[in-house]
A protein has these predicted regions:
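Short metal-binding segments enriched for Cys and/or His
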Residues: 1-2, 29-57, 63-71
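Long, contiguous alpha-helical scaffold regions
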Residues: 65-145
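Short structural boundary motif marking the start of a folded domain
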Residues: 3-7
Length: 145
């Protein structure tokens, strides 16, 4: 089972779904979350923060190193490593991808009851288009699609 959380950003106007691969890192590894509206409240520290299309996640690097070493991870622990390897990253491709996915499923629910094949094809078409847009916009996780 993998841990996930939905913390509010510093200004409390936005929230992001955050996923913790294999529950290796505890929730407290996220010190602060900054949305595009409140990111100016801090100076980006590359040694503790990852940036993704205007969002910043600030990690407690001591906590991250401790838990990753306990797990036997033999790799330099950086914010990029933590994020890109999924140890503490978006749940989906972006901060709100989980909600967007749920919205699409809800929207297509009537189709699912009528024609499952058409439902799956439409779901695939919509999600692939969304992923292409996320990639074009520059979302970090979407770049590997």
């Amino acid at each position: 089972m993998c841990l996930h959380q939905k913390p509010a950003c510093v200004c409390k106007r936005n929230k992001a779904y955050i996923f913790h691969r294999d529950s290796v890192l505890p929730e407290r590894v996220v010190i602060n979350l900054y949305c595009p509206e409140c990111r100016d409240r801090t100076n980006r520290d590359q040694s503790t923060m990852i940036e993704d299309v205007g969002w910043l996640i600030e990690y407690d690097m001591e906590v991250a190193r401790f838990y990753l070493e306990l797990k036997g991870v033999d790799h330099p622990v950086t914010p990029e490593f933590i994020f890109d390897e999924g140890y503490c990253t978006w749940y989906g491709m972006s901060p709100n991808d989980l909600e967007e996915n749920a919205r699409v499923h809800q929207e297509l629910l009537p189709l699912q009851k009528k024609d499952k094949l058409l439902y799956f094809n439409e779901l695939k078409r919509i999600r692939l288009a969304q992923f292409a847009e996320l990639k074009k916009t520059g979302w970090r996780k979407a770049q590997n699609i």
